[in-house]
């Protein structure tokens, strides 16, 4: 027996979300169908449309914003001499939750992953060149997965190529972060220690 095309399309749509398989997608779909108060569905639909129509990337760092410049880049109270390079928007969310880092960010839009054909040129590296003039420190904050380490190494080489001032520090989050673990699963203390104890990350021969 087949469901209606509308139901099947919604089930298929839910499977696009990370970690959502067919059974979970079916559960979500029939939960919505069984809602007596259809306003809940309309509420969800409204905010999904707003997400599509209102959210874009910051012209400077690539973080999510509803304006051309995000709240971090436009905040004069932030430390504009420090940039933390992260893979995606969720990483920024993790660091902001601990309220321990007060510099700026640069979002790459992913990690280098040759198995998925994600190369350096597919990520947001080029716009980083324009941000190096007034910087004193750049923190490379990719996770400790294989892809994260490859991206960190490439980031270091990229920065060394374009940095004219050798006094600018290139640092990396301290080890102690479990290998292969996403920032989203780390507690506040671990993240704070990783920032506080970050290491010099200039080059193999230095």
Curated annotation (Swiss-Prot):
Q: Does the keyword Lyase apply?
A: no
Lineage, top-rank taxon, reads Bacteria
Q: InterPro entries of this UniProt entry?
A: DNA_Rcmb_RecR (IPR000093), Rcmb_RecR (IPR023627), Rcmb_RecR_Znf (IPR015967), TOPRIM_dom (IPR006171), TOPRIM_RecR (IPR034137)
- Toprim domain span: 81-178
Which processes are annotated in GO (biological process)? DNA recombination; DNA repair
What this chain does, per the entry, is described as: May play a role in DNA repair. It seems to be involved in an RecBC-independent recombinational process of DNA repair. It may act with RecF and RecO.
- What HAMAP family would the database entry show? RecR
- The protein depicted here goes by the name Recombination protein RecR
Q: Which organism is it from?
A: Phytoplasma mali (strain AT)
